[in-house]
Amino acid sequence: MKNVLLKRAAAVFAAGWLAVASAPAAHAAEPLPKLSVTVFAPPSQSIWIPALIQRAGLDRKHGFELVVTPKPSNVAYTDFATGRDPVCFCAAIAAVSRFKQQGGNFTLLWNIFNFESDIVLRDPAINDPKQLEGKVLQTDTITGSWALSKWFLQARGVDLGKVKIKSSSARGAAGLAELQLGRIDALLVNPTEGAAAVAQGKGALHALPVFDKAVWQKAAGTDFVPSITFGVANDWIAQKANQDLARRFYAANRDAAAFIRDNPAEAARLVAKDAQVDVAALQTVLERYRDLMRIEPLRKHIKTVALLTQKLLPEGGQLPRPLTDAELDSLVSNFDVEAAHE
């Protein structure tokens, strides 16, 4: 009888020990929370950081799994503005401000990219944007990049009434073909596309930067323009679990941006396939624009956003009217993304 009791006690102890020992393993096996984000389809620069986060495992480092969905710019903006996509990694201030005026239920958490764009040309004699007058310029006019480019071109003395603007959402090779065939005179694109086009042109193409630091410092008193931001639906960020996800994603963003600045060659190798850009061309962009990525809470720059949305963009015709103070406060989130995540 004694032996039977001892065996039963041993069995109970063993079962309890196994349960305790297996608990950490079971906990470790629990799936990570997923964060699904929309980006512009490649070769948009909005795919760089999410792709690097995935390739370098920075999402898992910060305790979540990132899912990236590339979409054409018009689809991405429509889905974000209507709430179909609650998370957008391609929310250009100049573009989504229009949606805010129309009652859009979203807010912007942090800046991702400063404004930069390039004008790619065949004619070597064109070395000043004013020489675009009388020419055909192709670009994607639905994007915030175009809205800011338009403001800079006008500020630099270009009469856009004398420039024929051809709008197209075609990216990469399609736009380059139009330029090489002589159907257009110039192509206004992001820095990645600009570098790729110049590289593929093998000496036949050159690029002019649109951003002018002196012009901007005179207008704003700062050295950069917040441009592409991380936007979320208000209902989404109101949920505690999503607040934690947003903070984890912000930390991963900061890590990715630091990696790109410190290791542009390796970053280009990791991201080029997703970005659909030649490794060498992408490396050139990352080295040329080391300060292009500026991951900071947008609320820190609300005065600059106010200047953009309440003065410069409306005066330039890129917004139908200035944002009201209430719209501005709603547009630029005061959610603390830098607080420690759980």
Predicted regions and their residues:
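N-terminal secretory signal peptides that target proteins for export/translocation
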Residues: M1-L6
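Bacterial N-terminal signal peptides
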Residues: A10-A21
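Short, glycine-/small- and polar/acidic-enriched structural segments
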Residues: A29-R171, E178-L181, D185-P191, K202-F211
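Short, solvent-exposed loop/beta-turn-alpha elements that line the ligand-binding surface or hinge
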Residues: K61, G134, F211-D223, D291-K300
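Pocket-lining segment of extracytoplasmic ligand-binding domains
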Residues: A94, A174-A177, L181-V271
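Secondary-structure end/capping motifs
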Residues: A238-G316
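Conserved C-terminal helix/tail region of periplasmic/extracytoplasmic solute-binding proteins
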Residues: Q310-E342
